[in-house]
Amino acid sequence: MSQPITRENFDEWMIPVYAPAPFIPVRGEGSRLWDQQGKEYIDFAGGIAVNALGHAHPELREALNEQASKFWHTGNGYTNESVLRLAKKLIDATFADRVFFCNSGAEANEAALKLARKFAHDRYGSHKSGIVAFKNAFHGRTLFTVSAGGQPAYSQDFAPLPPDIRHAAYNDINSASALIDDSTCAVIVEPIQGEGGVVPASNAFLQGLRELCDRHNALLIFDEVQTGVGRTGELYAYMHYGVTPDLLTTAKALGGGFPVGALLATEECASVMTVGTHGTTYGGNPLASAVAGKVLELINTPEMLNGVKQRHDWFVERLNIINHRYGLFNEVRGLGLLIGCVLNADYAGQAKQISQEAAKAGVMVLIAGGNVVRFAPALNVSEEEVTTGLDRFAVACEHFVSRGSS
């Protein structure tokens, strides 16, 4: 008989880079999860914008099981049918001509930054190596991507960091313009800063970045790891803005919970990457590709994408009612089903405490820094699940406010 597993085992056995909740989920269906004790939770965290179709979706399970019954892995000395079908779906649905597959958003961003450096090196020379990123950004945890992310708390302990990376103020085209010049090889930006507080870019800002990149022969990289695959109500957020990048990174929702990432590129950009210039053992794995292909098939429909916009309205309307009652938030912002509630000055820095109260009440939410409660639910979350989950969130807000005033 196997040893019973408890939450305390995490503290005993795991390298402590996470501080997980005190309960352990063991089963999920749709937008509901149950823990070891049988307690039910409505899941508005979505595995941090990953579980785009909820838990244990029957068609994703079928796609995974079908491929699992054939073969699991060969390595990149061989290709496979699943990954080629997935590549064609992404190319047909976006600006891209070529795709590189990997396992995560960080790997996709690493590949994008490496491609940008090589593109500039081959076309213009080694002097053109500068990367412009943005304060409060998040692009992953590799040394290169954590350096591009504009949050020193994630990078300062790992110096010396890769050089020639500078950070402008987000949504400030003048700040970006002061840093972008002929030595810049790339600008990397999130259309919505997710970890940085659910802050949407303005159209003028992204259009201005496109123009600056064109003027200085720099590549424009959109990090759509969190915003991609229907999260905003378009397949990718760049489609909202009418601004097309040279490179786009995608992961999270692309696999619906199965690890997969991708770099999308134009033909011109992709041409500098030749055999041996980059790679990954598991990228394009047939299991991941089979699941991701089904995810795209289910999400890239007018019904699903329009449904995301409708669900956005459900959330915002109910969250504003809750806020009118308890007065916690200055603003409810975001696009589609990436929504942030910004705490007012009286409750600054207490987003984590609210998320903990929410879990006690039976609803899972995220934070984006100390001041923003973040929602990233499944794109197919039902109206009943939204209502039930936000009723529980209202209870959590009531408990939080009453605890603070007691």
From Swiss-Prot:
Source species, domain of life: Bacteria
A family per Pfam: Aminotran_3
EC number(s) stated in the UniProt entry for this protein: 2.6.1.81
Signal peptide: none
Reactions that this protein is recorded to catalyse: N(2)-succinyl-L-ornithine + 2-oxoglutarate = N-succinyl-L-glutamate 5-semialdehyde + L-glutamate
Keyword Transferase attached: yes
Record PTM N6-(pyridoxal phosphate)lysine, positions in chain: K252
Keywords: Aminotransferase, Arginine metabolism, Pyridoxal phosphate, Transferase
Pathway stated in the Swiss-Prot or TrEMBL entry: Amino-acid degradation; L-arginine degradation via AST pathway; L-glutamate and succinate from L-arginine: step 3/5
Cofactor: pyridoxal 5'-phosphate
GO MF term list: identical protein binding; pyridoxal phosphate binding; succinylornithine transaminase activity
One GO term (biological process): arginine catabolic process to succinate
Function as written in the Swiss-Prot or TrEMBL entry: Catalyzes the transamination of N(2)-succinylornithine and alpha-ketoglutarate into N(2)-succinylglutamate semialdehyde and glutamate. Can also act as an acetylornithine aminotransferase.
PANTHER family cross-referenced by the UniProt entry: AMINOTRANSFERASE CLASS III, SUCCINYLORNITHINE TRANSAMINASE
Similarity comment text for this entry: Belongs to the class-III pyridoxal-phosphate-dependent aminotransferase family. AstC subfamily.
The name this protein goes by in its record: Succinylornithine transaminase
Organism field: Escherichia coli O157:H7
Highest classification ranks of the organism: Bacteria, Pseudomonadati, Pseudomonadota, Gammaproteobacteria, Enterobacterales
